[in-house]
Amino acid sequence: MQAYDDEIVGTALASNVLALADRVRTADGVEALSEQHRLALEHPGLRAHHLVVTDPAGAVVGYASVLGSSVEMLVDAAHRGEGVGHRLAEAALAVEPTLAFWAHGDLPGAAQLAEAIGLRRVRELWHLGRDLAPAGAGGDEAALLATPLPGGERLRTFGGTEAEEHAWLALNARAFASHPEQGAMTLEDLRVREGETWFDPSLLWLVHDDGDGALLASMWLKVPDAATGEIYVLGVDPGAQGRGLGRALTDRALDVLRARGVDRVELYVEGENARARALYEHSGFTPVAVHAQYGIP
């Protein structure tokens, strides 16, 4: 077992782990690492701790990423049943005994390992999706963005200034105060995402009150390829809840993605967030998969 602090993960190790993640995704039919943990591997400085298991030839066959209060693990399908997952879990808990383990796709092997080390299911993340019909009349993106929201709120796109970054982070922290990952985003986390190839400032929207100009909400869209879009982050200030901003922004997002030729939209939502799930179900989203987190009961 080898352990690496964030600052000493080399390019070769990162490449080997990402190759392992690709093999695991192919074997299991689900992404093996979340974006957050993948970025922590690719960008030293995002406060992660990395654990690696190699075979006698030096090939990476197991990996765990400890980031904040959570850990994600992956084991090469050809080496399952050899105790690799158990070794990684024990090593991760030695780093932080109260860690919670993500099981992407909530596969049986992950659930069995969690039970074996005394953990219980404590959280669910729902992956939802829907298809989009081609854009019809009125599908011009510029016109859609220029049109005020139903309550008169003004929508503008992100300009990339430091003031906007800090304003967005403050809104994000308020909107996701109870969310252990999203609500803890830092300026460095935001800027790493701004540097990703998929980032498009015209798809990060800031919604201001038409009266005092206060930042009320934000919609961040992600289009990783021409056919697929994602409602990446939808945040509404708690003081602006009940104004219909979430639904209005979701409708606007679907219209803009449709205008761009996207034919499939996906998103992730907390399983216990019944209000958000109802919003998305009303907008035509249906379950694709459920990711589970296991922790101390």
UniProtKB/Swiss-Prot annotation:
Which Pfam families does this entry report, sorted A to Z?
Acetyltransf_1
Extract the InterPro entries matched here: Acyl_CoA_acyltransferase (IPR016181), GNAT_dom (IPR000182), Mycothiol_AcTrfase (IPR017813)
Give one GO term, molecular function aspect. Answer: mycothiol synthase activity
Report keywords, A-Z: Acyltransferase, Repeat, Transferase
Top-level enzyme category: transferase
Q: Does the keyword ATP-binding apply?
A: no
Binding sites annotated in the UniProt record for acetyl-CoA 2: 234-236, 241-247
What region holds the N-acetyltransferase domain? 155-297
Q: Name one GO biological process term.
A: mycothiol biosynthetic process
* Sites where the protein binds 1D-myo-inositol 2-(L-cysteinylamino)-2-deoxy-alpha-D-glucopyranoside: 35, 181, 222, 230, 268
Q: Which PROSITE patterns match?
A: GNAT
Which CDD domains did the record assign? Answer: NAT_SF
EC numbers: 2.3.1.189
* Binding-site list for acetyl-CoA 1: 73-75
Q: Which reaction does it catalyse?
A: 1D-myo-inositol 2-(L-cysteinylamino)-2-deoxy-alpha-D-glucopyranoside + acetyl-CoA = mycothiol + CoA + H(+)
- What job does the chain carry out? Catalyzes the transfer of acetyl from acetyl-CoA to desacetylmycothiol (Cys-GlcN-Ins) to form mycothiol.
**Subunit:** Monomer.
- What family does the database annotate? Belongs to the acetyltransferase family. MshD subfamily.
Q: What is this protein called?
A: Mycothiol acetyltransferase
Q: Which source organism?
A: Beutenbergia cavernae (strain ATCC BAA-8 / DSM 12333 / CCUG 43141 / JCM 11478 / NBRC 16432 / NCIMB 13614 / HKI 0122)
